[in-house]
């Protein structure tokens, strides 16, 4: 079920942050890729640019994306659909 509101999109992105932080391998990859440390996340999670970047991180790794979607019972197409609601989305 696709949703086109930012509140829903933020909820999914925050679940993605939780998923990233609870898996050591994914967390290390996220830190290496972004340079953002877990201690900085309390402030960062309020930034829509950051939340869009979190979705980009998962969208770039299909295995992790599918694991996230399975864990949270989310349609695997949903993160890509809601990504466009955040700043910096690519429309190609």
Language-model-detected regions and their locations in the chain:
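Metal- and O2-centered redox machinery and metal/ROS homeostasis
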Residues: 1-92
């Amino acid at each position: 079920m696709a949703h086109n509101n930012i509140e829903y999109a933020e909820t999914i992105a925050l679940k993605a942050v939780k998923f990233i932080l609870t898996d050591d391998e994914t967390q290390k990859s996220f830190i290496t890729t972004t340079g953002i440390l877990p201690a900085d996340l309390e402030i960062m999670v309020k930034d829509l640019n950051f939340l869009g970047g979190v979705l980009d991180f998962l969208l770039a790794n299909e295995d992790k994306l599918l694991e996230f979607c399975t864990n949270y019972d989310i349609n695997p197409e949903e993160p890509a659909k809601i990504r466009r609601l955040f700043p910096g989305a690519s429309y190609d």
